[in-house]
Regions:
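The AdoMet/dcAdoMet-binding core of the Class I SAM-like
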Residues: 117-261, 268, 274
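Short, solvent-exposed loop/turn elements at domain surfaces
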Residues: 98-101, 108-110, 199-200
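Conserved SAM-binding loop and adjacent beta-strand
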Residues: 106-119
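Membrane-embedded alpha-helical segments of integral membrane proteins
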Residues: 1-34
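Short, well-structured beta-strand/strand-turn elements
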Residues: 15, 271-277
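Basic, ligand-binding patches in group-transfer machinery
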Residues: 30-103
């Protein structure tokens, strides 16, 4: 109930306060049922009512409380913070350094993100003469798309990202559209907000080049996007001589995970070439 329904809809802060309110109400109800056996029933009732009022107020102002707490967590100014049904999105800024955090984990800094996104896109795309159809899985920030659109041969880019709040934010916020060069609003772009695994299962399109830009596999829902089942689906959607590039953690800080992903790709028939940017 907590991870499937409440947390995605209400957020972690509001859900936690809701359970606290339920506990306070249960305590108050129990005290009232046994009021004849409890000598301090009036004080207990006042305490339960007071706790319930405070928790109810906390539920009402949960978003503001979360933002205030994040102001203490992040060293830079928080310019955007919102909980979507899928994740907590926070954007910070210090001078010209804009950073994206998802569930508290740094995803990029505008000062050096180009090193990652250029390395993610250009080696693979330059190996394909006249690639026309491109698939981007994840990458709702539009930064990988920005690099893809530098190729005149590209006619269409399909972006599949689970969270509509991410693609909305990075296609509308002026600071972020400057960063991704308004890539998500290009007429060549088709944005689909869906689970990438399920979308690949149902879709029959073929692509010359695929960019798989998911966060590191830190939980089950992300881990399934690094499995043999997922990579088999991906391979079926590549055209003849098609190429896919996969974000594969770090060979320095997550060496075992990195090489596990390489071996998983090889096991489904990919000719995998591992590389990383310095």
């Amino acid at each position: 109930l907590f991870p499937i329904l409440l947390a995605p809809k209400l957020g972690v802060m509001r859900t936690s306060l809701l359970f606290g309110l339920l506990n306070a109400l249960v305590a108050g109800g129990t005290a009232w049922l046994f009021r004849r056996q409890l000598p301090q029933i009036r004080m207990m009732t006042i305490q339960c009512l007071g706790a319930s009022v405070l928790l109810l107020a906390g539920i009402f102002y949960a978003e503001r409380l979360t933002t205030l707490a994040e102001g203490e967590i992040y060293s830079d100014e928080v310019i955007y913070a919102k909980s979507s049904p899928y994740q907590r999105i926070v954007i910070t800024r210090w001078k010209d350094d804009v950073r994206l955090f998802l569930n508290g984990h740094l995803q990029f800094s505008s000062r050096d993100e180009y090193r990652y996104h250029e390395a993610l896109v250009h080696p693979g795309l330059q190996s394909i003469p006249q690639a026309r159809r491109v698939l981007v899985l994840g990458g709702g920030d539009g930064l990988a798309v920005r690099e893809v659109l530098k190729y005149d041969s590209v006619e269409s880019v399909t972006v599949v990202d689970l969270d509509p709040e991410m693609t909305r934010l990075f296609s509308q916020h002026p600071i972020l559209t400057r960063l991704n060069q308004n890539s998500l609003n290009s007429p060549k772009i088709r944005i689909i907000n869906a689970d990438a695994f399920l979308w690949l299962e149902k879709n029959n399109d073929f692509f010359d080049f695929a960019v798989v830009d998911f966060p590191d596999p830190s939980n089950f829902s992300l881990g399934k996007l690094y499995t043999t089942a997922f990579y088999r689906l991906l391979r079926r959607h590549l055209s003849e001589n098609g190429v896919a590039v996969i974000q594969a953690t770090s060979p320095l800080f997550a060496r075992q995970s990195y090489w596990c992903i390489v071996k998983t790709l090889q096991s489904v028939g990919f000719h995998a070439t591992p590389y990383h940017a310095y």
